[in-house]
Amino acid sequence: MILKSFLLGNLVSLCMKIINSVVVVGLYYGFLTTFSIGPSYLFLLRAQVMEEGEEGTEKKVSAITGFITGQLMMFISIYYAPLHLALGRPHTITVLALPYLLFHFFWNNHKHFFDYGSTTRNSMRNLSIQCVFLNNLIFQLLNHFILPSSMLARLVNIYMFRCNNKMLFVTSSFVGWLIGHILFMKWVGLVLVWIRQNPSIRSNVLIRSNKYLVSELRNSMARIFSILLFITCVYYLGRIPSPILTKKMKETSETEERGESEEETDVEIERTSETKGTKQEQERSTEEDPSPSLFSEEKEDPDKIDETEEIRVNGKEKTKDEFHFKETCYKNSPVYETSYLDGNQENSKLEILKEDEDNKNKKWFEKPLVTLLFDYKRWNRPLRYIKARFQIKKAVRNEMSQYFFYTCLSDGKQRISFTYPPSLSIFLEMIQRKMSLSTTERLSYDELYNHWIYTNEQKENTLRKEFITRIEALDNGSLTLDVLEKRTRLCNDATKKEYLPKIYDPFLNGPYRGTIKKMFSPSIINETSRENSIEKFRINKIYGILFAIDYREFEHTFDRKSLSTKIGYFLNLINQFTIESPSNLNLKRLSLFPEQGKVDSDSEDQAKFLNFFFDRVITDPKDQTIRKKSIGIKEISKKVPRWSYKLMKNEEEGETLVVYQEIRSRKSKHVVIFTDNQQNADTYTANANKDIDNSEQTNEVALIRYSQQSDFRRDIIKGSMRAQRRKIVIRELFQANVHSPLFLDRIYKPIFFSFDISGLIKLIFENWKEKNKKLKIPNYAEEKTREKRQKAKREEKARIKIAEVWDTVLFAQVIRGCLLLTQSIFRKYIILPSLIIAKNIGRMLLFQSPEWSEDLKDWNREMHVKCTYNGVQLSETEFPQNWLRDGIQIKILFPFCLKPWHKPQERSLDKDSMKDKVKKFCFLTVWGMETDLPFGSPRKRPSFFKPILKELEKRIRKFKNKCFLVLTVLKERTKLFIFLRVSKETKKWVIKSVLFINIKKIIKELLKINPTLLFGLREVYESSETQKQKDSIINNQMIHKSSIQIRSMNWTNYSLTEKKVKDLTDRTSTIRKKIEKIIKDKKKLFLTPEINISPNKASYNAKRLESQKSIWQILKRRNSRLIRKLHYFIKFFIERIYIDILLCLINIPRTNAQFFIESTKKIIDKYVYNNERNQKRIGKPNQKKIHFISIIKRSVSSISNKSSQIFCDLSSLSQAYVFYKLSQTQVINLYKLRSVLQYNGTSLFLKNERKDYFGFGAHEIFHYELRHKKLRNSGMNQWKNWLRGHYQYKYLSPIIWSRLVPQKWRNRVNQHCVAQNQNKDLSKWDLSQKDQLIHYNKQNDYEADSLTNQKENFKKHYRYDLLSYKYINYEDKNDSYIYGSPLQVNNNQDISYNYNTHKRKFFDMLEGIPINNYLGEDDIMYIEYIKKNPDRKYFDWKILHFCFRKKVDIEVWINTSINSNKNTKTGSNNYQIIDKKGLFYLTQDQEIKPSNQKDLFDWMGMNEEILNRSISNLEPWFFPEFVLLYNTYKMKPWVIPIKLLLLNFNGNKNYSKNRNSNRKQKGNLFISSNEKKLLKLENRNQEEKESAGQVDLGSDVQNQGNLESVLSNHEKDIEEDYAGSDSDMQKRTKKKQFKNHTEAELDLFLKRYLLFQLRWDDSLNQKMINNIKVYCLLLRLINPREICISAIQRGEMSLDLIPVHKDLTLTELMKMKRGIFIIEPIRLSVKNDGQFIMYQTIGISLVHKSKYQTNQRYREERYVDNKNCDKFSARCQKMIGNKDKNHYDLLVPENILSPRRRRKFRILICFNLRNRSGVARNPVFCNGNSCNKFLDENKHLDRDKNQLIKLKKLKLFLWPNYRLEDLACMNRYWFDTNNGSCFSMIRIHMYPRLKIR
C-alpha cells in the first residue's frame, strides 16, 4: 500500500512538473495565440480560397511563408531587444504603414497602373508572388502595432515576465503557434474541398440560376478582400485617437503649476517627468500664451530623453545664484533605450538652460511633425478624470506608472528596484560614460554580499555587547537612569542646562522644524500647548490660489522682491476693493490678468496686503479677533503625477465662471429657483444640492436636475475615444444606470432562471401543506408595506417614463408648456365659473338660496403656481427660466371643488383626524385633469351628485320612520278601541303596505315601543333571521376593525386586506355551525311548523303564540338557551385562547394587532346575541377568578388552598377591575387603549357603563399623545404599538425577541421562577409559578421546602427570568413583567438563588466573564442553543442610544471591577442613559475609581466633549472607531470591557473620589440631572448593595415632569460646555475669553470639525428638499401666511427645519431640530501618538487571566498620576497583576537603548544573515523562552507562567516603543506606495532570540 501511494505521488508530481514546464506552457500559449485572428488572416485566406493552378500554388506557399516569417519575427522581437525597438518605436511603423495601406489599395483596384504589359508566365518577372509574401509578412508585423489585436496574442508577452528560460519559452510558444496554424490551414482546406465536392451546394437554385456567379465572384474576390481589409483597418484605426482631430485642452493658470516646477526631490522629479508633454498641443492651439506667468516650464520634444525645467521671471534671465539647481528628469522609458543617447546632449544635463523666449511662442508648423501628429499624453484614451479634493490642485494622472526600474544593491545583492529615482539612474549613466572603463572595477556578487554581511554582523555584535553590558549593569543594581541610553538634545544655555523646546530640537524632530500648518502628534507637544494644537485653521482661498500648499511653509517671510509682477497686478486690483469694503473682498470685478502698467510695490495698502498673505493672520470679520497660529508637523507624502490643466464639469460652471467644460458629465439642467435682484449682494448658500450662479447683477439659487436617462457619457473627457470604453447596454427604455454586459448575471436574472422555484414547490405540495396546516397568523403588516412599496415603485417608474418621453421628444416641452397654460386659463376662467353659474341657477330653480359668495371665495382661493419641471414652486406670475426648453409644471393650490351646498365648519374630533391627510394641492395635466404628483395618474374628483343622493336617502329614511310611527299608532288604536268595526281588509292593506317597505325596521320599532306586544312575532322572525343577525355581528366586527384603522390613520396606515378576510372566514366557520345548531334546537323547542310561513302571516301567528304561552315558559326557554350557549362558549373560548393568544405572544414581532387586542375579546360576543342582558350575565363575579398571563400574581396561601382545575376564562377578569387598575396607571401608557375608549359605535367587548365611567377624560388623556416625542411608525400594527408603549419592549433587543419561538418560549419564558421578597426573608417565600395558559393541571404548594426541591429549576430558568426582571425595567419604581400592561406590580420583588451566585445579567460578557463559566453545570440544551444562535452573546448595536458627552478615564475601560464570584453576593448600580426618546436603566456592575488626574481620557483619544446626539440608526460602520472593537468583540466577546461602549459618564472624575464615609456630593458645578443620579448611586450604602433588587433611583418621568426637562438639562450642559465653562478645560488651560456667544460657538465648532464630520440625516433629505420647494414660493408672496399655514398642515413644510433666528448659534440650531446634524467621528490618524497606539493594541489583545476565570486574587485599583510613562506602566502593571514593583521595562529589554539605536538593533538581529534565501522567513511566533533568562528569577510577576509567555510574545511582537507608524514610514520609503495601503507589502517578522557570539 505504501509502495502504491509512493508511486502515485511520484506520478502526480511528475505530471505537475511536466505541466508546469516551460516547454508545455509555451506550447499551450502558442496554441492559444492561433485564435487571435486579425486582418493579416485576410491575405492568408484569400490565397487559400482564390488561387488555383501552378501560380496559385506558388502564391499559397508564399502567403504561408510570409505569414509564418512575420509571426516568427514577432516572437523573436519579444526576446531580442534591438528588433523590438525597431518594430516598437512609437511612430516608425505607423508612418510606414499608412503609405503601404494606400499603395496596397491602389494596387488591387488599379492594376493597370502598375502592369508592365508583359504576358509572360515567368513568375519571377511578375511581382504578384513577392507582393503576396510581403503582404502577409508586413501585416503580421503591423498587427501588433497599428492594428490592436486581441488579448490572446498578448498572452506570450505576459508570461515572459514570469518565465526564467525565456528563449526556450519563445521557441516552444512559436512551435505551438505553428502547430495551431497548420491545423487551422488543414481545416480550411478540408472545408473548401468539401464545398467543391458537395453536389447539394453546387445544385443550389441561386447558383444554378446565375451561371456566371461563381466566376464573377472569383474575379472580384481580390476587390472584396481589399474592401474588407480597408474596412477592418478603418475600424481598428477608429479605436486609436485621430492624431490631428483631437480635442485640445486649455491650460490652467500657470500659478497653479508652480508647485510642480518648484520641487527638488527625486520622487518629485519622477512625477514631473510624467506630467510633461501635454503643453505642446496647448501651445499649438493657443499659439501664444496671453498671460505672463509667474512660473512656467519649458519642454522639449518628447522623443528626446532629457527634459529639463527652467524658471522664467518676466522674461529676465535668472542667475544660478538666485535659483537652486533643478535636477534633470528622465522620460518614462525602458532602461535599455540608451542607444539613442547623443553624446552632445549630455553636456546640457546639469545646466540651467539660457532663457529662450522664442521657444515659448513657437508656431505649430515649427514643431516636429511626429510630435505634432502623435502626443500619447493627451486625454485621448478614455480615462476617468479624478477630481482633486481642493480646487487649488489639479487632477491625478492615474494611467502613468509610478515605478521606475533600475538595478541597485539591496541586502548585499544586486536587484531590480522598481522605485529607483530616475534622475539618479541618469546621473550614474552619465558618470559611467565620462569615466574610462579601466578605472571602474566591478566586484563580484559574492564579494558584495560577503562584505555586506560582514559589516552588518560587526554592527550587530557591537550593539549586542553594549546591550548585554547595560542589562548586566542593571542586574548588578545600578540605577535605572544610569543604565538607560540617554537621548542627545540641544541646549539653549550650557550653564543653565536649558534644552531647546521639543518642537525645535533637531535630534528629536528631524531636519524640518518650521512651524508648519499641520497637526502635531501629542507625544511631542507640551501639555500647555495641547489646546492650541487642535485649533482649526481655515486656509484663505486667495492664499490658496497664489501659493499651493504642496510644500513646507515656514513662518519666516519670503523675499518679496522675488515676486513677479503678476502678483503686483493682482494686489493692485485687490487694493481698490479693500478701500471700498475692507471686510469683504468682492471679486466680481476682479481680473487676474492685467493688461498694462506696473504697480508700485511700496504702497502702504499693498504692504498690508502682503502681510495678510505672508504672515497669514486670519481675522474673523465679525469681531476682528485674530486667530492663533496652529502648529503641526508636515506629513510625508509622495507627489503624485498630475495633469497640467484642470478640467471642469458642466455643473461646476456656475461656481467657477468657466464658460466651457471639458468633461462629458451626465445630462443635467440648471433650474433657477430664486433670483435676488440686489446688486453686489453677497450671497453664499452652503447647501449640498444648491448651486450658485454669481452673475453681474443677480444672485440666483439654482438646483441641478438630472435626466433619468442612462448616462452614456460617464464623465469621459471631451476628445477621448469612446470606442475604447467598456461596452455598456441598457435593457429598459429609461434606465437610470447603464451596465456592462459582463455583469448582467449579477444584476438581472437570466430568462431561463426567472421562474420562482419556491413558488413551484408550493404549488406541488399545496395539498400536502393544507392537510398539515396549523393555524398561523400571517404577517399582514409586512406584506402590506411590501405591496405598498412595490406599488409606489411601479408608479414612480411610470411617472419617470412619461417625464422622460416629454423631455426627449423634440419640441415636446414647448407643446406641453403651451397646453398646460391653455388648460390652466381654461380651467380657471372658463370651466369653473361656468360650473358655479350653473350650480347656483339650479339652486334658484329648486327654490334654494344661491351660494355665490362661498363659491367665488373658493374660486378665488385656487392658485395656479408655476413650477419647474421637477415641481419646485415659483409663483403665480413668474415663469421658470427657459421654461419652453426645460419644461414647466402648474401646481394648483387649494383646488376648487364644486359642492352642492356648503356645510358649517363644525366638525368632530374623529372627522378631523380622518381628514388630516387630505391633500390640498394637485398638479395640472395636459388633459386638464388633476394628479397628486407630476406625470402621475389622474385622481378621482369628488362627485357633485353623491351628497345629493345621500341626502335623498336620508329623507326617504325619515319618511319611512314616520310611516312606522303611523303603523304603531294604528296598532295601538286597534287594541284599545277594538269595538270599532274596522274592516279586516283595511287593516290588512295598511300592514301589508308598511311591511312591504321594510319588515326588519317594523319589528325593531315595535320592539322598542312595546317588547311584549309582538313577542311571538319576534320569535318567529328570529327563526328566519338569526343567521343573518349572526352574520351581521361578524361583519360588524370586521367593519369595526377597519373603522378603527381609518380613524387612527395617522399612525396605522393600512386597512384590512382580502387575505385577512379569507383567513378570518375559516375561523368563523365553526362559530356559524354552532349558531346554526342553536337555531335548530330553538326551532324544535318553541316553534310549530305552521308558524314559518310568510312575513304577512307571522304577525297573526305571533299573536296566537303569545296568547298560548305563559311567562314561566318564556323564562325557561331563556335559561335553557343561555345554558346551551355557555357550554359552547366556554369550550370554544378555552380552545381559542390556547391557540390564538399563545401564538400571538410567540410571534410577537409578527403578531397582527387587531387580531390580538380586539378579536380575542370579541370572540366572546360571537356567541352572545346582541343583547346587553347577556353581557351582564357573563360579567357577574360569581365565577372563579382566573389569572391572566401572569399579570395578577397569587399569594402563597391562594396557591396552597386551590386544588381544583383553573379555567382560563377571560371573562372572569372583570372589566371594573381592569379599569380600576388602568386608572392607577400613569397617563403616558394609556394611549394604547385610545381606539377602544374613543370608539363611538357599539363596542362589542366593552360595556357602555364602564366606558362612560372611565372615558370621562379620554380626550384629555390622549391629548398627551400629541406631545409624546416618539412618533408612531406608519408600518407598525396595533399590537406592536401597544408593546411600544411598554418600555420593556421598546428597549429589548430584536435578538431577544427572536428567541421567543414557540417551543423555546414555552420552556424558557413562561415557566419562569418568581421569587418574592417579603420582609427580607429570602429563604422562606421562594415559589415556582407556572403560566396558567400553558398548564392547566393543579398547582403544588412550594412553600418552605421549595429551596431544595427546585434547586436545579432555579439554575435552569434563572437567566430567562432576567429577560423580564433585570434588563427590562419600567420607569416607575417597581418591576413589572414583560407582558405587563401594568395592572398589578409587586413591590420589593427579588430573585433569590439557593446559593448566592453572582446575579447574571443579560449582558454576561460585558463584565469580562465568558459564557462558558455559566454553562459548566447548567443544562446542555442551552449550550446548543448558544451554538445555534451565536447572536446571543453579541452586542446589539441598534438598541442602545449612545450619549457621548464627557469621556471616562482610560482606567475605567481597562480596570473594570468584576464583582462576580460564586461566594459573594453583589448588587448592581443602575446607570441611566438619557435619550430624546425616553429613559431606561441599564444594569451594570461598575465602580468609578478615585483618581487625581486632571484630564479626562476621552474614549478614542479625543480630549473633547462630544455632543449629545442620539443616534437612532446605529450601524457598525457609523462610528469608524467602533468597527475594530465590534469585529474584535464578535470574535472574542470577553476581550473588550464593553462598559465603556455602554456607559459614558457625564461628570468629572474628581467627584468620584467623594465616595467616602461622609458621602457628600461635591463634584462639578455643572453636573446634569443624570450625573446627580450617578452621584446618588455612588453615595449609596454598601449594605444596600446586598439586596439584588432594583435600586430605587427616586427620579422618574413623573418627578421630572416630562421628557422635555431632561432634554433641557442636556442642552444646558451643551451650552455650558460650548461657552467654555467646563471645569476640566479650566484645570488644564485658561480658556480664551470670547467677546460674544457666536465666536465661542464658532471656535468650539471649528475645533470639533477636526474630530467629526457633519452630514445630513438621510431621513431628512427629502424633508429639506420639500422645505426648499415651499420656501421658493413663500419668498415671492406678499402675504404668505395662508400658504404657509396650509403647507405646514399638509406636512410639506417642517417648522423644525426653519432657522428663524438672525444670529443663530450652533446650540440653538441643535435645540431646534434634533437630528439634522449627525456628528460622527472620523479617523484621528494625526493625533494618534505612540502611547495611544500602544494602548489600543494592548487594550484589544491583552487579556488578563481574570477575564477567563472569575477570580478575585488580582483585583486592585491603581491610582495613576499624570505622566504618560507612569500612566502606561501602571496600566500594564495592572494587567500583569504585579502589585509592588514596576518591572514593566524588563519585559522589553530593548527599551534600555534609545529609539533610534533600538530600531537599528532590531533590524540587525532580525536578519538571519547567513541563512537567507531571498527574503528572511523567521517563525511567526518565537520560542517562549526568548527572554526567560531575564525574567525567571523575578518573583513579583504574575503567577501564571503561561500568561506571562503570552504577554512576552505580544511585547516582542510589537515595536518596543509601539511606534507602529514607523512601519508605515519604512513602508512608504522602501516600497514607495502612495495609495493608502501602508501595510500591504511589508512583512513583519517576530524577533528571534538574543544570541551571544
Swiss-Prot record:
Residues 249-317 are annotated as: Disordered. Coiled coil: none annotated. PANTHER family: PROTEIN TIC 214 (PTHR33163:SF40), PROTEIN TIC 214-RELATED (PTHR33163). Involved in protein precursor import into chloroplasts. May be part of an intermediate translocation complex acting as a protein-conducting channel at the inner envelope. This is Protein TIC 214. Residues 298-309 have a biased composition (Acidic residues). InterPro entries: TIC214. One of its GO terms (cellular component) is chloroplast inner membrane. Keywords: Chloroplast, Membrane, Plastid, Plastid inner membrane, Protein transport, Transmembrane, Transmembrane helix, Transport. Residues 249-258, 268-287 have a biased composition (Basic and acidic residues). It is a multi-pass membrane protein. Part of the Tic complex. The chain crosses the membrane at residues 18-38, 63-83, 87-107, 127-147, 175-195, 224-244, 1126-1146. The gene is TIC214. Belongs to the TIC214 family. One of its GO terms (biological process) is protein transport. It is found in: Plastid, Chloroplast inner membrane. It holds the Pfam family Ycf1.
